[in-house]
């Protein structure tokens, strides 16, 4: 989700929420790599359910950052299998595995998908042009480029969208690989695998959320089920908190470890040797992973969100929901973030401070089970609005200081390298001589870049080649025309700037030339607008200038928002910004409206709406009211989406920008209602989000709608579109100002083509259902196979409802819509990889549906749960409550949890911060079963702190009294001694005399 740097900020502020994954390495015997034993105990602790957001796996496998991309789609799918298998060997779920692929998204998400895919197509075009230029330069120096390399084009990642042939092949491949593992891996015998492919509407992570909500509604659900979700998106943290499941963690790659990796640019990957590819493959396979523990985050938040003196009872679950809601204002995939809020500037802390001030004055919390309390929200935003001007001024001062500090460090670095000299001026007049040494008539005006590019022609021209002389003269005349209006004063100014910033003079002059090209293009466009109003060509020189910036921006994006370089390297890496025409708005190019708005100066309110919406001052008030109404509807929709499911498939926010915080007033009595509607079909979404350049992913009958000038919806697919940097530094952070889709016009045009679809194309344009696959060792195999696939039963409408107790899964199953047979065969859909066809005698495949929720989902901890042992020390809690770190989060690249802290004991507790009672009859039977089977509870984080005896570290369960005799290492929950040694005893924890204050704070809370 669109919350840049949220994970980085969160892990720095709450360092103990993360810990490294303990990954077993396969053994190598006689050069053969032996697979890991999936059934062996997990060094990270046992896990019940694992959820995979498959798009987070497919994308990096299709275009990896540290190695050349796969040559074919089959290689991509094999890479997906390998990566998924590695994740499963780390997590080792024992009961349920859910693979969720993004299906058709709500309209609110489509706008963001549309912007991403249009920019992705543009980046792919730039990369292809860069490849061609690199190959041309290499051929000029005599290098031979193979035809296979020359003709290869970058694979279009926009194919990873529901309805494309690739997604259809991905679904078949996942079903095959799951069946293969169930049939061949003994460790999978009890695993139940649900695959929700792209034909099932909804985003992958929210399909997972719907699954968890459905399981919690089952009366037989075990409240101590352990959950883990894999993915890099920031919203997975919100989703983990929104489930209110106490045993939840997130598995993700360690992005901190990536920072020191060598990254390969475009030139490196064109003619890479096999040895280099194998090295990168090994380096990529060694990418470390880490856990993010939601239960530890809840511990931090229990201290962070504590507010004394409330007129109502403090409820941690409601407070966490309010915290999640406030984070939405800093960024999400459905709404633009408020201009005054940025996670990197500790905006969440600003909102939290306001929340703590206003909460005692309110009657209740801001949210309840995903529903907003609008008067409370208005109070919060009004207080934020009163701080908005100061926030903008502080941001401007900090950015100026960072820029000054960077330039100072850069100058010192250059001086130490002897680079503080006057920059070399590019040769402006290059004299040419004939073969007899006579001076040629006239003179050439060539830049250094021209001389490098025309090196071969210059050599031939010196030898008297007329064709080469003509080509060089053509470039010289072109430069003369461009330099005609640039005065000597401007040249001197460029030299001065180059001296001041240590930039290359040629680059500064090139920018001046390109700026003039912008003016010439604009004049030509106005003259020829009657002839051609839609086709605007970009000059070759502009493409060359922007090429390096685009590639560098992609590298910076992969490094995951490296803050220190974001504010400092823009002047070299960001594209040239054009002048903003606030009266009508630019038609293409990259610009920055914030250069005109100047949010840090008085009067920014009117300038903001004038520059970004091109309205007159008289129309601002009406625009403001409508934007505030739509934005509040949006945050209500987002909150409902996270806690209850999609409230409306057709609602979307109809603006590219958010209102200012000072404008949020007068909405407390707003009545918010949503019409649920229905999701688009896959082809309808493809036509909504894909650019014309990606039309190859659609059936041919739709492509003319995207490219023909007489198409009734041609205006939805602009070839050029403006990008507003909106005050950001890197090009990927800019806002693509694309026209919003008119749903009625689009659906009318698309549905008129449906009768022309082939059967195969029509099969990809459906709303499907998830499938459930189990092995013949599963507890439900006999029941399901007999009722659904027996020869005596020919009724295709038979459904079987089953509940959680027997297998840890509940739902409704029916016959597989693809015609699964008990004695059939599953054909491998992938060429290569030596994967065999499978017999279906060892597995069972069924259509799967969730049990409908009887009522609204409640945001509570379920009765009968068993809390984990606390991980945080008194000092950790004090540092949050009393802000010892003063908001300077300095964890850097170290883990808050080391390996020892990752292995924490888990056991029943008599005193807990949660309101529902602990234990109960479910816990009694749960522990009785554990004792009989001599196994560890599934919500442990490790095994090293347990001895060979069953139970919880030599503790004894005394009937139903919730009285436990704990090991002396954990007596009275009050720790003392050396914090690093892990040995705790006694009744107090002594650390800088902080314990007394901590005890007093706990007493006050009670």
Curated annotation (Swiss-Prot):
Q: Which organism is it from?
A: Saccharomyces cerevisiae (strain ATCC 204508 / S288c)
The record describes its quaternary structure and partners as: Interacts with RAI1 and RTT103.
Q: Where are the sequence repeats?
A: 955-958, 961-964, 972-974, 975-978, 984-986, 996-999
User: Mutating residue 537 to A leads to what result?
Assistant: Causes mislocalization to the cytoplasm
Q: Which gene encodes it?
A: RAT1
The identity of this protein, by name, is 5'-3' exoribonuclease 2
pH dependence (UniProt free text): Optimum pH is 8.0-8.8.
Name of the top EC class for this enzyme: hydrolase
Sorted alphabetically, the keyword list is: Coiled coil, Exonuclease, Hydrolase, mRNA processing, Nuclease, Nucleus, Phosphoprotein, Repeat, rRNA processing, Transcription, Transcription regulation, Transcription termination
Q: Where in the cell is it found?
A: Nucleus
């Amino acid at each position: 989700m669109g919350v840049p740097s949220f994970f980085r900020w969160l892990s720095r502020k709450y360092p103990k929420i993360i810990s490294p994954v303990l990954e077993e390495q396969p053994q190598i015997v006689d050069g053969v790599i032996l697979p890991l034993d999936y059934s062996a105990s997990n060094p990270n602790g046992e896990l019940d359910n694992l959820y995979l957001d498959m798009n987070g796996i497919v994308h990096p496998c299709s275009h990896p950052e540290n190695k050349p991309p796969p040559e074919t789609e089959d290689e991509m799918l094999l890479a997906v299998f390998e990566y998924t298998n590695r994740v499963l060997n780390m997590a080792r779920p024992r009961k349920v595995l859910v693979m969720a692929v993004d299906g058709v998204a709500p309209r609110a998400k489509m706008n963001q998908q549309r912007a991403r895919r249009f920019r992705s197509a543009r980046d792919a075009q730039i990369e292809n042009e860069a490849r061609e230029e690199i190959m041309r330069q290499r051929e000029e120096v005599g290098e031979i480029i193979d035809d296979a390399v020359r003709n290869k084009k970058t694979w279009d990642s926009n194919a990873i969208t529901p309805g494309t042939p690739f997604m259809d092949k991905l679904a078949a491949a996942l079903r095959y690989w799951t069946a293969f593992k169930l049939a061949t891996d003994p460790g999978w015998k009890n695993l139940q695998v649900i695959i929700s492919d792209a034909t099932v509407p909804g985003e992958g992570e929210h399909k997972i959320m719907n699954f968890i909500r459905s399981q919690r509604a089952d009366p037989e659900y075990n409240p101590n089920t352990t959950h883990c979700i894999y993915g890099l998106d920031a919203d997975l943290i919100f989703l983990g908190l929104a489930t209110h499941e106490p045993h939840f963690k997130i598995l993700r790659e360690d992005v901190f470890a990536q920072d020191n990796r060598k990254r390969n640019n475009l030139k490196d990957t064109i003619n890479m040797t096999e040895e280099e590819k194998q090295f990168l493959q090994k380096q990529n396979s060694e990418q470390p992973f880490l856990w993010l523990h939601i239960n530890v985050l809840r511990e931090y938040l229990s201290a962070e969100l504590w507010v004394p003196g409330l007129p109502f009872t403090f409820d941690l679950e409601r407070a966490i929901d309010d915290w999640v809601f406030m984070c939405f204002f800093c960024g999400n995939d459905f709404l633009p973030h408020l201009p005054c809020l940025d996670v990197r500037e500790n905006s969440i802390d600003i909102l939290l401070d306001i929340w703590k001030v206003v909460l005692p004055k309110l009657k209740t919390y801001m949210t309840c089970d995903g529903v907003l309390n609008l008067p409370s929200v208005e109070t919060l935003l009004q207080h934020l609005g009163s701080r908005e001007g100061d926030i903008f001024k502080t941001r401007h001062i900090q950015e100026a200081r960072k820029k000054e500090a960077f330039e100072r460090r850069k100058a010192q670095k250059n001086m130490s390298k002897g680079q503080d000299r006057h920059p070399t001026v590019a040769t402006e007049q290059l004299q040419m001589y004939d073969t007899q040494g006579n001076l040629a008539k006239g003179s050439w005006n060539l830049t250094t870049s021209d001389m490098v590019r025309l090196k071969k022609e210059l050599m031939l021209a010196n030898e008297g080649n007329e064709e080469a002389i003509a080509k060089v003269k053509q470039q010289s005349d072109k430069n003369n025309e461009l330099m005609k209006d640039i005065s000597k004063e401007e040249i001197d100014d460029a030299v001065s700037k180059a001296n001041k910033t240590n930039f290359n003079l040629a680059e500064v002059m090139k920018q001046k030339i390109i700026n003039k090209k912008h003016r010439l293009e604009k004049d030509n466009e106005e003259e020829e607008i009657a002839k051609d109003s839609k086709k605007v060509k970009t000059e070759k020189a502009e493409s060359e200038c922007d090429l390096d910036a685009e590639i560098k921006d992609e590298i910076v994006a992969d490094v995951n928002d490296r803050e220190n370089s974001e504010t400092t390297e823009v002047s070299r890496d960001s594209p040239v910004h054009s002048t903003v025409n606030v009266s009508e708005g630019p038609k293409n190019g990259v610009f920055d409206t914030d250069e005109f708005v100047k949010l840090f100066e008085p009067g920014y309110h009117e300038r903001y709406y004038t520059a970004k919406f091109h309205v007159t001052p008289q129309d601002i008030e009406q625009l403001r009211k409508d934007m505030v109404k739509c934005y509040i509807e949006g945050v209500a929709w987002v909150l409902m989406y996270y806690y209850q499911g999609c409230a409306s498939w057709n609602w979307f926010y109809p603006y590219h920008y958010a209102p200012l915080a000072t404008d949020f007033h007068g909405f407390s009595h707003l009545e918010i209602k949503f019409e649920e509607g229905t999701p688009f079909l896959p082809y309808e979404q493809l036509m909504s989000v894909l650019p014309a350049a990606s039309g190859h992913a659609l059936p041919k009958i739709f492509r003319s709608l995207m490219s023909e000038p007489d198409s009734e919806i041609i205006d939805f697919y602009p070839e050029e579109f403006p990008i507003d940097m909106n005050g950001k530094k890197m090009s990927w952070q800019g806002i693509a100002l694309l026209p919003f889709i008119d749903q009625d016009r689009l659906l009318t045009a698309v549905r008129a083509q449906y009768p022309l679809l082939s059967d195969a194309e029509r099969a990809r344009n459906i709303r499907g259902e998830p499938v459930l696959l189990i092995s013949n060792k599963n507890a439900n195999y006999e029941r399901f196979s007999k009722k659904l696939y027996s020869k005596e039963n020919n009724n295709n409408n038979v459904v079987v409802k089953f509940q959680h107790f027997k297998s840890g899964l509940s739902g409704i199953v029916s016959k597989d819509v693809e015609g699964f047979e008990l004695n059939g065969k599953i054909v491998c859909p992938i060429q290569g990889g030596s994967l065999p066809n499978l017999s279906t005698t060892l597995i069972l495949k069924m259509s799967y549906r969730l049990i409908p929720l009887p009522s609204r989902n409640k945001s509570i901890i379920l009765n009968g749960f068993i809390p984990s042992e606390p991980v945080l020390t008194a000092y950790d809690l004090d540092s949050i409550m009393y802000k010892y770190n003063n908001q300077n989060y300095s964890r850097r690249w170290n883990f808050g949890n080391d390996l020892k802290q990752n292995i924490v004991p888990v056991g029943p507790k008599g005193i807990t911060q949660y309101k529902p009672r602990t234990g109960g009859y479910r816990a009694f039977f749960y522990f009785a079963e554990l004792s009989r089977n001599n196994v560890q509870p599934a919500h442990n984080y490790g095994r090293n702190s347990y001895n060979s005896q069953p139970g919880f570290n030599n503790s004894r369960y005394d009937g139903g009294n919730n009285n436990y005799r704990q090991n002396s290492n954990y007596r009275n929950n009050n720790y003392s001694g050396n914090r690093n040694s892990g040995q705790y005893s006694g009744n107090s924890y002594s650390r800088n005399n902080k314990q007394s204050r901590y005890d007093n704070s706990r007493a006050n809370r009670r």
